[in-house]
Amino acid sequence: MRIKIPFFGRKSINGANVQVQVYSATDIGLRRANNEDRCVSLEGKDSPGFADAVMIVADGMGGQAHGEVASDMAVEGIIRRLADQPKDKTLPTGGYAELLGQVFREVNAEIYLESQGDTYRGMGTTATAAVVTGTRVHIAHLGDSRAYLLRDGELSQLTRDHSWVAENVEAGNLTLEQARVHPNRNVITQAMGINAEPAVQTKTLDLRDGDLLLLCSDGLHGLAGDDEIKELLQSGKPEQAIKDLIQRAKDRGGNDNITVVIGTVRRQG
């Protein structure tokens, strides 16, 4: 579990300050031999490049130890490219999300190249990243790991699952209940390493005082509904919420690795 001191981000153009505190944990679950999930939670001086805080979840796939290789490559590649950016880099609104999307495409190219060879053939990984700059958070996403925002007691999903069942729910071919038990529920349509040119989702949001950001792998959201997740997030401090979320997934069978990253926000001004 990462527990770090609060950090006040750089001043935005309107003079506001945002305090971000990040927490994370990953658990192998009850059914898997290896943990193929990876996560990052960095803030303040530990954050790479222009970022005031960074949160990443990657859920590897590919059999044997290949999923671990892919998720390692994803988080390391994202952090390395962010670290190459100047600390004082400034971009217009939307520019940071666009840059983060390009970072995802470059890291995907590395993983995709390895996945075409004999050693790591077929490996891939989901990747969801949230990067805080000033008073905004920028998100990039591939796969079915998720980013959520808890604001004013309401939990909203910020990312759209790149999965067969999600696309069929959106098209009206399946209900949410049918999707949860469908035999194709684990089929991913976009991820790092499986497409040469992935369709990276990106977005930018203004942060408000009291916001809570949650990133998680499907080992959590596949076993706990959004209402349950919201209840546990609101029930106590972030450190305890992470423990409770992981335990809830394990109580439901823990059939996958479980990873949770939380960022709490206090905004002044």
What are these regions (language model features)?
Residues M1-G269:
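PP2C/PPM-type serine/threonine phosphatase catalytic domain
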